[in-house]
Amino acid sequence: MSKPAITLWSDAHFFSPYVLSAWVALQEKGLSFHIKTIDLDSGEHLQPTWQGYGQTRRVPLLQIDDFELSESSAIAEYLEDRFAPPTWERIYPLDLENRARARQIQAWLRSDLMPIREERPTDVVFAGAKKAPLTAEGKASAEKLFAMAEHLLVLGQPNLFGEWCIADTDLALMINRLVLHGDEVPERLVDYATFQWQRASVQRFIALSAKQSG
């Protein structure tokens, strides 16, 4: 059986947290893929000639042969189904309830905590940008993040569900918006996010982002 041709589309700076998530999913699966970029600042993603125009006009966009898919959580779930364990590495928990919880965490991180995303955009994470102090809304959102994360994390475990899963990367990214800016974060969550950030697949993306930014 021939290997599929896989392409992942990213923003030109590799700042997108959702591209990071899709990148890590592909890397952890052990899949070979090509990277292509599109300049969001100039509106290239809004041109009808771009492959992602007929999807959501956002990155990441995954292309596998003649199939195209956008939205990072959909990409991760598709990869888990198409390149399924045990033949391929697992990126979601084996346990049914834990797998559902991981997907809940992913959905929550993408739909909530808007003040953090607005006040601590990912140029803070990948380019060391400095922003104004958190507003009252930002602080309230951070407190919600801390409370939820501390409830989800089992004391003494470095991952959400024992074994690493893709939701760990997504949660660590949200926490690191604050940690890497120097905002006050509970020590337990700093340790968790720092540990997750050392994962090889994450470090490869950070290096790629630094290369583009530098």
From Swiss-Prot:
Residue ranges constituting the GST N-terminal domain according to the UniProt record: 6-87
pH dependence per the UniProt record: Activity decreases as pH is lowered from neutral to acidic.
GST C-terminal domain location: 95-214
Any coiled-coil regions, as ranges: none
Disruption phenotype: Deletion of yfcF decreases the resistance of the bacteria to hydrogen peroxide.
Alphabetically ordered keywords of this record: Oxidoreductase, Peroxidase, Transferase
Alphabetized InterPro entries for the sequence: Glutathione-S-Trfase_C_sf, Glutathione_S-Trfase, Glutathione_S-Trfase_N, GST_4_C, Thioredoxin-like_sf
Protein role: Exhibits glutathione (GSH) S-transferase activity toward 1-chloro-2,4-dinitrobenzene (CDNB); however this activity is as low as 1% of that of GstA. Also displays a GSH-dependent peroxidase activity toward cumene hydroperoxide. Is involved in defense against oxidative stress, probably via its peroxidase activity.
Family: Belongs to the GST superfamily.
SUPFAM superfamilies: GST C-terminal domain-like, Thioredoxin-like
Class of this enzyme: transferase
Gene: yfcF
Known regulation of activity: GSH transferase activity is inhibited by S-hexyl glutathione.
GO MF annotation list: glutathione transferase activity; maleylacetoacetate isomerase activity; peroxidase activity
Effect annotated for changing S10A: Nearly no effect on GSH transferase activity
Protein name, UniProt field: Glutathione S-transferase YfcF
Catalytic activity: RX + glutathione = an S-substituted glutathione + a halide anion + H(+)
Entry-linked Pfam families: GST_C_4, GST_N_2
Organism: Escherichia coli (strain K12)
One annotated GO biological process: L-phenylalanine catabolic process
Record EC number: 2.5.1.18
The keyword Ribonucleoprotein is annotated on this UniProt entry: no
